[in-house]
């Protein structure tokens, strides 16, 4: 888990070593947390359009947590997988993308993990701020 230039905190970039071979999150800091992951690529126009609302949702949830406005206090993490990234550990994620999101069909896509395990659903119903916030708060 690291920080990069495209997204700033509170969105974290995930790497191959953050997952086991079955696609489970294994980062100790993410235990007992709800983690929403945006799977995206820089060349993807839809991803570029979706990044603003994703980042805005991440900041909004963190602000709610800071002010005690959510029962998920300090338990929601926003992360991303940079499928076309050039950092060590990013491209290797493509090898297990089918384990991380078995129903993946294109960029951007979203997947939710709770306590390191993937939740079997289709993700938020849309890419906008309200869809993302309602999804992680639900």
UniProtKB/Swiss-Prot annotation:
Keyword Lipoprotein in annotation: no
InterPro entries listed in its UniProt record: Thioredoxin-like_sf
Contributes to redox potential value, annotated site positions: 45-46
Similarity section: Belongs to the thioredoxin family.
The protein's name: Putative thioredoxin-like protein 453L
Domain of life: Viruses
Span of domain Thioredoxin: 3-138
Catalytic residues as annotated in Swiss-Prot or TrEMBL: 44 (nucleophile), 47 (nucleophile)
């Amino acid at each position: 888990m690291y920080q990069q230039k495209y997204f700033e905190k509170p969105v974290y970039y995930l790497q191959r070593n953050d997952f086991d071979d079955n696609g489970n999150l294994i980062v100790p800091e993410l235990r007992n947390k709800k983690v929403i992951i945006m799977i995206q690529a820089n060349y993807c126009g839809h991803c570029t359009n979706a990044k603003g609302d994703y980042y805005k949702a991440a900041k909004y949830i963190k602000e709610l947590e800071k002010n005690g406005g959510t029962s998920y206090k300090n338990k929601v993490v926003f992360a991303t997988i940079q499928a076309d990234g050039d950092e060590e550990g990013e491209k290797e994620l493509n090898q297990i993308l089918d384990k991380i999101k078995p129903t993946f069909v294109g960029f951007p896509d979203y997947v939710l993990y709770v306590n390191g395990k993937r939740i079997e659903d289709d993700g938020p119903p849309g890419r906008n701020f309200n869809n993302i916030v309602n999804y992680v708060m639900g």
